[in-house]
Every structure is written in structure tokens, then in C-alpha cells.
Design a protein with these regions (language model features):
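Intrinsically disordered, low-complexity, positively charged segments
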Residues: 1-22
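Buried, small/hydrophobic-residue-enriched core segments of structured protein domains
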Residues: 26, 32-41, 49-54, 59-234, ...
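Structured beta-strand/loop patches that form or line metal/cofactor-binding pockets in enzymes
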Residues: 44
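Conserved small/polar residues in nucleotide/adenosyl-binding loops
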Residues: 255-260
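N-terminal low-complexity segments that are often proline-rich with Ser/Thr-Pro
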Residues: 263-266
Length: 266
């Protein structure tokens, strides 16, 4: 909604705009003069951002002379349709996560920089706890968070060295990406080794854990949880990424939830 209001308040036609429109030879001089002096005089009614809405309910109402309303119609629909879509999907995903934090990492797959930036804002409105989009964080004052990439791991001679260096740089927010080579045979043993070294060195393990970005996340998360618990790190965070939607998240949580027998034996 903020973007809609900013657009309408700033809408005007400068000399370059008017010269281009005139060159098309499809508008008469009276219309071009009208555009030169254009100022939106209508009223806009809208529900507050973040309000739950249902299909076929009006989100925004524009009351204005028909010429003014038609000039702003396409832009309003373009802004609202995309961001409502992102906010709605984010809300569904966050609801499926049942209170676990959901991060927005969508910039690289967005339809252009503006879509990625405003999509990040919409995702936070929908319930996401933060974004990897630093520009969105600066513009909209939303939390900026993230981990390291596979390229970080591959830039070092081996996985352990990459993990150790990252832990030195970010000891209070140490989330290690364990699936670059082999999650269970390489990534997890190396991550656990680094966590043990941090603990032995007296470094507080305030926020730490692993991230998985590939494979059968439901199956792997259960295996990973067991490895962390057996190594003495029951409070380590397990985070997942890569094409997660509400259905996959629900499946992962269902698969990894302890059964009554698990609870009895634990």
C-alpha cells in the first residue's frame, strides 16, 4: 500500500514524457496539456497492510474522475497483485511452520530487482522473520539475516577449514551449510567437529546449527537431529532451504515429529 500511495503522490509528466507522447502522433494537444498539469485529485480507501482478506473482497477503492482513475489503474494493480501474492504465500508457509522462523531468500529468483525488493517487504508482512535482501532491509527497516553459500565451502581446500573459518568470523551466529559434498558423511561430521572445538575453546554457543539445501529434507533432518543430539548439541538449530512451500514444510514437520513411542523412549 505504501508503494501505491508514493506512486500516486509522485505521478506527473515531465517535458521528456510529453515530448515522447507527442512523437507518437496519437494524442491531441489538449490531452497533452492536461497531462502537463496532471495532479491526482481523487480519494483512496484501503484496508491496513497485514489485514486478512478473502477472495473477491475489495482491497483498495479509488474514487476519482474517470480520467484520473484510468491513469492510475494499471500501476495500482501491478503493485498490489504481485505483493499480495507474495504476502499470501508467505502467510501460508509461516502457518505451516507452526511457529518456527521462516526467512525470505527470494531475490535471485524474483522477476527483476524491484520485484525482489518489494517482494521481500511483502514476505515480512506475511509473517517472515527477515530477509537476505540487504537493500530491502535498508529501505523498509526489516531484519536482515543469512548464512553462507556453497561457494564459500568450495573456495577453501576442504569443508572443515571452511566451517572453522566461518565459525571464527561469526561465533555468535554460526549456521553451517552441510550439503555441499555429502550431508551425513562429510558435512555433519565436520560441523560437529567445529562445534566441539568451539565449546572446548570456551566460545559460547549462543546461536548455532546447520542448514541443508538439498536432498530429502524430511529424512535428512531426522538423521541430522540424531547426530547432533548424540554429539551433545541438542539445542543446535536445523534449518532447511531450497524450494520449500507450505506442503513440503508440513510434510517435514510431520515426518520429524516424535511418535508416542519416541516420546516414551526418550
Amino acid at each position: 500500500l505504501d508503494q501505491v500511495i508514493e506512486y500516486i503522490k509522485d505521478l506527473h509528466f515531465d517535458e521528456n514524457d510529453l515530448a515522447y507522447l507527442k512523437s507518437l502522433n496519437i494524442f491531441d494537444d489538449d490531452f497533452l496539456e492536461y497531462l502537463a498539469n496532471f495532479h491526482f485529485s481523487g480519494d483512496i480507501y484501503a484496508i491496513p497492510e497485514g489485514t486478512v482478506i478473502f477472495p473477491r473482497e475489495p482491497i483498495i477503492k479509488v474514487v476519482a474522475p474517470i480520467m484520473e482513475a484510468q491513469l492510475v489503474e494499471t500501476a495500482i494493480l501491478n503493485i498490489l497483485n504481485h505483493q499480495c501474492l507474495i504476502a499470501t504465500k508467505s502467510a501460508r508457509v509461516c502457518y505451516a511452520a507452526k511457529g518456527d522462523g521462516v526467512m525470505e531468500f527470494g531475490l535471485r529468483r524474483a522477476q527483476g530487482p524491484d520485484a525482489g525488493t518489494y517482494g521481500a517487504r511483502a514476505a515480512v508482512i506475511g509473517g517472515c522473520t527477515g530477509t537476505s535482501n540487504v537493500l530491502a532491509g535498508q529501505l523498509f527497516d526489516v531484519p536482515v539475516k543469512g548464512t553462507h553459500a556453497h561457494s564459500w565451502i568450495m573456495s577453501f581446500p576442504d569443508e572443515y577449514t571452511a566451517f572453522k573459518k566461518y565459525a571464527e568470523l561469526y561465533p555468535s551466529a554460526c549456521i553451517l551449510l552441510v550439503d555441499t559434498y555429502d550431508t551425513l558423511k562429510s558435512g555433519m561430521p565436520n560441523a560437529i567437529r567445529v562445534f566441539k572445538e568451539m565449546r572446548e575453546a570456551g566460545i559460547p554457543l549462543t546461536f548455532y546449527g546447520i542448514r541443508m539445501d538439498s536432498g530429502d529434507l524430511a529424512y535428512l533432518s531426522k538423521k541430522v537431529r540424531k547426530m547432533l543430539d548424540e554429539a551433545g548439541f541438542p539445542d543446535a538449530v536445523i534449518s532447511a532451504s531450497n524450494d520449500l512451500d507450505e506442503y513440503l514444510i508440513e510434510s517435514c514437520l510431520l515426518y520429524t515429529s516424535p511418535s508416542p513411542r519416541d516420546v516414551e523412549e526418550s
